[in-house]
Amino acid sequence: MSSPDNSSPSLRIPPWLRVKLPCSHTFADTRALVEGLGLNTVCNSAKCPNMFECFSSGTATFLILGNVCTRNCAFCNITPGHVSPPDPDEPRRVAEAAARLALRHVVVTSVTRDDLDDGGAAHFAATITRLRAALPAATVEVLIPDFRGDHAALRTVMAAAPHIVNHNVETPPAHYARIRPQADYRQSLELLRRVKAAGGVAKSGLMVGLGENDTEVEGVLADLADCGCDIVTVGQYMRPSRQHPPVERYVHPDTFESFAACGRGMGIPFVFSAPLVRSSYNAESAYNALCTLRRKPA
């Protein structure tokens, strides 16, 4: 597949990636509530381009287990370095924030904690349990690390019964040594297979603009379809700072639509593919759409 994309990292950000900042009291209120409870959000820590829209609608993706990571993925804006012990009160505060925001769909992610024996799985489980008790009508989505391939850690998370388990593969395997040097593509696929085998809703995602080509993206979609992924997100990589890898190409919206059609053709029920799509963006809509599809008669 060829695509009408701009492959020069020196050119300006195209107009379809320019975000209009909304004026909203809800944005300020959401941010104040989260910060007042001593919580982190991936929206702020990762400089997500959708933060203003999400905060203005009263939603957020909670970042647990601190805001310092034990890994140093090239694309990520979260600081690597020395980490602190998990805060045992954090699950309660996440649930309190979600309840005060009256969330219908709660997304929880974390930094990678290779220093912990279980990679933070028990902390995830405690957070899920607290959320389900505080908001029994809400759905809970977790975006988890790979737990270094620890199957017992994944079982701990699954036992807490999250509605969606998301684990992003991020980029095609040929680029892992440069972009995700401490991760393993096949290990990530195996995690997703195990989520499906346990009866869970499996979700994954990747970015484009990190040096991959369209054929490689289609290869990742094929792998995710083979894993049985229910939901896949594809979005544009945006360079957080000059210390991060430059954007290799800005992918045209038409090409994103082609990726979505390709993934659906491979059997993935929902592929959300657009320049500003991120793994947590419109997460509630994606889950509701999947539930609607499953209720339809064959």
UniProtKB/Swiss-Prot annotation:
Keywords: 4Fe-4S, Cytoplasm, Iron, Iron-sulfur, Metal-binding, S-adenosyl-L-methionine, Transferase. Binds 2 [4Fe-4S] clusters per subunit. One cluster is coordinated with 3 cysteines and an exchangeable S-adenosyl-L-methionine. It is found in: Cytoplasm. Its EC number is 2.8.1.8. GO terms for molecular function: 4 iron, 4 sulfur cluster binding; lipoate synthase activity; metal ion binding. InterPro entries: Aldolase_TIM, Elp3/MiaA/NifB-like_rSAM, Lipoyl_synth, rSAM. It catalyses: [[Fe-S] cluster scaffold protein carrying a second [4Fe-4S](2+) cluster] + N(6)-octanoyl-L-lysyl-[protein] + 2 oxidized [2Fe-2S]-[ferredoxin] + 2 S-adenosyl-L-methionine + 4 H(+) = [[Fe-S] cluster scaffold protein] + N(6)-[(R)-dihydrolipoyl]-L-lysyl-[protein] + 4 Fe(3+) + 2 hydrogen sulfide + 2 5'-deoxyadenosine + 2 L-methionine + 2 reduced [2Fe-2S]-[ferredoxin]. [4Fe-4S] cluster 2 binds at residues 69, 73, 76. It comes from the Bacteria. Pathway: Protein modification; protein lipoylation via endogenous pathway; protein N(6)-(lipoyl)lysine from octanoyl-[acyl-carrier-protein]: step 2/2. It holds the Pfam family Radical_SAM. SMART domains: Elp3 (SM00729). HAMAP family: Lipoyl_synth (MF_00206). This is Lipoyl synthase. It comes from Nitratidesulfovibrio vulgaris (strain DP4) (Desulfovibrio vulgaris).
